[in-house]
C-alpha cells in the first residue's frame, strides 16, 4: 500500500513531498520503489518504500542528549555529535526537532540547556547552527523559532509575549539568518543526501569540544568551513586545517550581538597560514566564541601567510544587522551575560590553545579516549 501510495502521489503531484516518521532501521524507506536494495535476502526489503524523506530520529536523540549535559562533561561524549555522520546518507533524512521533544514534561528546547540564562540562549543558538550546517533538511516545531521558555501545551497558545524581548528577538534573527544562509549557499542544500557533500576536518578534539568540517556544493568554489565550540569559554589562536590558502570570510557567527551574543570572532575574515594541520595543506588561526559556531567561505584575495600572526578577537556581523531590525536592549543587561562580554579580556588561564584544555576543565580526571570518527561519511 505505501509503495503504491507514494508512486501515485509523485506521479500525479510532482511538487508534493511524502515524509516518514519512522524509528526503526528498516532500509530503503526513502528509496525508490524500484530501488533494488536488500536486507538479509528478505524479498519485502528488496525495494524501497518510495517516501521522499525520513526523520533522522538518531540524530535528534544523540544531539539533544549532548546539549543537555553540563559543558564539563561534554568532552566525554564527543561521539554523540559525530556518530550521525556514519549513517547520514543511508536515507534522505530530515533533522527533526518536533513537538515530541517539547511535551509531557520534557521541557522546551531552551529550558533543556544547561547554565545561566545567557548560556541557555547561547547553547540554543549553537544547536541551531549545528542543525542548519549538518546534512539533511530541517524541521523545527513552533515556538522554537524564538526560543520559547515553556514546553508546548496543546490546549493553549505558544508564549507570544516573550517573542519580542531581547534574547528571544536574537533567536528570531538567528533563524532568519540561517534560513538565508541555507538558501544562498549551495553547499548547505545541493548535496544534503550525498556523502560527497560533507567532509570532516576534525571530529576528535574532545578536550575542547570542538568540531570542524566542510560542506561541499556542486561547484568547489561554494565550499564552506564550519567550526563549532561547545564550551562556554573562547578559544584563541585555535588552529584548524584548511583546504585552500588565501582569505576565508566569516559569513556567519552565532555569537554576533544581533543574535544576543558577545561579538567574539575574527573581524570578518582570516588569512590562511601556509603551515598545514589536520592533514590539510593550510591552516586558519581562529578565535572561537564561547558556545559559538562559525561559518567561513574562501574568497579570492591574498595568498597564504608564511608566519602565524595573532589578531585581536572581534568579529564582523554588521551585514546581519542591516538585514534585520535591531532588538531593543533592556536598559540593564542581564547579569548572566556580563561574564561573556567580548570587551573584557579573557583571564589568561581561560585562554585555550590547541595543546591544552581550558582551566575549567583542567581539574577533572583523565578523560577516556574519544571515539575516532571516520574521515568521510558513507554514502
Language-model-detected regions and their locations in the chain:
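Conserved alpha/beta catalytic core and glycan-binding cleft of carbohydrate-active enzymes
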Residues: 1-154, 183-255, 262-263
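Carbohydrate-interacting/catalytic domains
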Residues: 118-121, 130-140, 144-379
